[in-house]
């Protein structure tokens, strides 16, 4: 990963963008996509795409990451100035206590920490039972409710995790918040950049959706706007290699993920064979992936009259927490694969994929 790409991801991952609050990510994406696109389109939920126009009868290829990251929303302020909150996206209670967060206010970001009880004050029963998220609060250092309001806190504000973008001792691994799914946002930008000035056999829509983490909502509206012939979702999925078991799905550094099954999608046969053939032909490392989660492909593939879809992913350790790790070789494989796939999608190829059900 070159320094320019690394800088792109440092900016993307550090921007705040909980579901329904993707505006800062969207503004940056529009700025970057506009450098390489013929024009920019946006739906009324906020999903945004750079468009490379092909011939009038050319197939429409949709490529999308999602802008939102798992986060929280302020729901109320207690009399002593602590904040009650609601999760946005899937969080496990055991990864939350004592984690740093930022509340995005009109006065700028306000630092806070999810409150925890020191072990000295816990009863035996409390020690052995995980705390429910509904009982957690965020401490911003306010003296009381009035002080919190003075600081700028209001119900409805977004809260995001805090984790600096950090190249690790093994420089092929990078630690940050929000790899799920600023990976897909950055790859959409880099796709248009790599194809800038090159003739395409299709009309390409590359960008990112909103509100994926709360039900794939942006994918549904974006697919109705674009009406694609094929869809490539770009998403980060959970690595499961921490135990050292090489048979588990999701191994860092072993190539891009080909998601063949999850709870929202059974991969289209024609797309599966198309991706596998291209990966084998060009010797691009890949790994099969089965997931209990879902991606934007879950909504897009059942939109309109049906859209053959594939997920070109990478795995990330510890997703849906403050601190997540990716391997840059996996990103390189995903990028190479996506470029090969998109440039191969002429009308004849797309028609053949559609017929291979």
Curated annotation (Swiss-Prot):
Give the EC class as a word.
Answer: hydrolase
Give me the residues that bind a divalent metal cation 1, please.
Answer: 66, 180, 235
Q: Which GO terms describe its molecular function?
A: metal ion binding; metalloaminopeptidase activity
Q: Which organism is it from?
A: Bacillus subtilis (strain 168)
Q: Which UniProt keywords apply?
A: Aminopeptidase, Hydrolase, Metal-binding, Metalloprotease, Protease
Task: Please state what the protein is called.
Answer: Putative aminopeptidase YtoP
Report the Pfam families cross-referenced here: Peptidase_M42
Q: Identify its protein family.
A: Belongs to the peptidase M42 family.
Which GO BP annotation is one of this protein's?
A: proteolysis
Q: How is the cofactor bound?
A: Binds 2 divalent metal cations per subunit.
Cofactor(s) this protein requires: a divalent metal cation
Q: Which gene encodes it?
A: ytoP
Record EC number: 3.4.11.-
Q: Where is the active site?
A: 212
